């Protein structure tokens, strides 16, 4: 794992193609792109067939249009998402804001985990519909249907690896933040700084005051 925030080098460095293509998430994304491309290409290419008695096209998976739509949809979205995150990986080290890096890594983690689940559902769905398909309904496109099922199965693991790598990057960023965080709470064992003692000055009588005469020695005026 590279040093820096969230598994990437510190911002400001130049783009290094060799280091970029050697990153585990980049290699896994390229594999995921190829797998997704094969899946939706097989469905778009030979996933819809027609019988001799009709010109209407049907999905090769037990004539279930939802199966073809689901497989092609997750394949196309997986391909586009992989391309997007490849661009993010290329410019990730140029992002200086740690908060932006965190949100990108979290987005990668959530999307990869979701697509791992969707590929699992797609594999089970396509396998179930293919098992229920009548042999007479599949004159062509059988190999493409099997290929779509096979590479859907492989996509489960590739996206699972991407989710695991994203989690490791997120955890590395959180750990780095905790290590560099300084608690502003003062140490209770540290004595408080004593305030400077107030200097006692000699009291001075304020001006413009009259001394109060005491009644001691008072004599009344003479009476005539």
UniProtKB/Swiss-Prot annotation:
One of its GO terms (cellular component) is membrane. It is found in: Cytoplasmic vesicle membrane; Cytoplasmic vesicle, Secretory vesicle, Synaptic vesicle membrane. GO terms for biological process: protein targeting; regulated exocytosis; synaptic vesicle membrane organization. The chain crosses the membrane at residues 30-50, 73-93, 105-125, 147-167. It comes from the Eukaryota. May be tyrosine phosphorylated by Src. Pfam families: MARVEL (PF01284). The modification N-acetylmethionine is found at residue 1. It is a multi-pass membrane protein. Ubiquitously expressed with lower expression in brain (at protein level). Residues 20-171 form the MARVEL domain. The keyword Mitochondrion does not apply. Keywords: Acetylation, Cytoplasmic vesicle, Membrane, Phosphoprotein, Synapse, Transmembrane, Transmembrane helix. Belongs to the synaptogyrin family. May play a role in regulated exocytosis. In neuronal cells, modulates the localization of synaptophysin/SYP into synaptic-like microvesicles and may therefore play a role in the formation and/or the maturation of this vesicles. May also play a role in GLUT4 storage and transport to the plasma membrane. This is Synaptogyrin-2.
């Amino acid at each position: 794992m590279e040093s820096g925030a969230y598994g990437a080098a510190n911002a400001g460095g130049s783009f290094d193609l060799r280091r970029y293509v050697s990153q585990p998430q980049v290699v896994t994304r390229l594999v995921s792109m190829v797998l997704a491309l094969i899946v939706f290409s097989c469905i778009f290419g030979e996933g819809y067939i027609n019988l001799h008695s009709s010109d209407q096209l049907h999905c090769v998976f037990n004539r279930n249009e939802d199966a073809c739509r689901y497989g092609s949809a997750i394949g196309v979205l997986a391909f586009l998402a992989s391309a997007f995150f490849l661009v993010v990986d290329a410019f990730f080290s140029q992002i200086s804001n740690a908060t932006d890096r965190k949100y990108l890594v979290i987005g990668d983690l959530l999307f990869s985990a979701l697509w791992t689940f969707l590929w699992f559902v797609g594999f089970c769905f396509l396998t179930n519909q293919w098992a229920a398909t009548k042999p007479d309904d599949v004159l062509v496109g059988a190999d493409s249907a099997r290929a779509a099922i096979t590479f859907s199965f492989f996509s489960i693991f590739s996206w699972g690896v991407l989710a695991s790598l994203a989690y490791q990057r997120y955890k590395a960023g959180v750990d780095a933040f905790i290590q560099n965080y300084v608690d502003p709470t003062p140490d209770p064992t540290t004595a408080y700084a004593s305030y400077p003692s107030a200097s006692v000055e000699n009291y001075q009588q304020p001006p413009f005051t009259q001394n109060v005469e005491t009644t001691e020695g008072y004599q009344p005026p003479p009476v005539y």
